[in-house]
Amino acid sequence: MKNAELLTAPIGLFDSGVGGTTIWKEINALMPNENTLFLADNKNAPYGEKTKEEIIALCDANTQFLLNHNAKIIVVACNTGTTNAIAYLRDKYKQVPFIGIEPAIKPAGLQSITKKIGVLATRRTLTSDLFAKTSEHLKQEEKIEIIEQVGEGLVDLIEAGQMESAEMTALLQKYLQPMVAEGIDYLVLGCTHYPYLLPQIQRLIPTSIKVIDSGYAVARQTRNILVQYHLLNENQDYVATHKWVTNGNLEILKQFAAYKDEKKHSIEVLKI
């Protein structure tokens, strides 16, 4: 592609489902004139209970789809995908920069007063080498106690649009109360789906506990890399186009992809 075409090529994002839309919102807020292409692999969600080999294969297929549609940068908008597959992707696809997502345990740990933080994430994220390396450093060097909790079942309910269901509330109570009892003062949402549960989570924990995720940091890093590679579209008059693609439930993705400012943005939701 020519330089002008590269500038308007889309930022590619993929996730195991709709969770990565939380990352898309941060990227769009920071860079509203960038085209985007979001792939929701709903058919294979959740990734958190799959083997590392399965996750790598799915992330590889997602990457190929985005590259076939001329993505200029790829955001792995999935914690499980990042912690298990991003090293493989960067090694295989050296022609394109990748942005990954890790649970924000480092900033949480460094800001914690009680030196106790909670992490709610998928099983595969919590057992990954990347998470183990970061958490071990915090434990050894900063003397931070990390209380880990697998959010089993949460992604399935979010994908089904049941964020406010009684079943969701029961699961959140089950997962959050032990961490609260341990005296955490930070709760890290270690899955891009989980920010959609923020209202429910805040109702179930003391107001003194701060809840953080990686969304804004990922958007900022994406912008930094686009600048570094001279790929940032700085034309403030450019009207961006956003395309959303799923291999699963079209109606669910439409709910999460909804954007209010239709005059400035064109959103296309397709089923592949």
Could you say what each language-model-derived stretch is?
Residues M1-I272:
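Non-catalytic structural scaffold of enzyme domains
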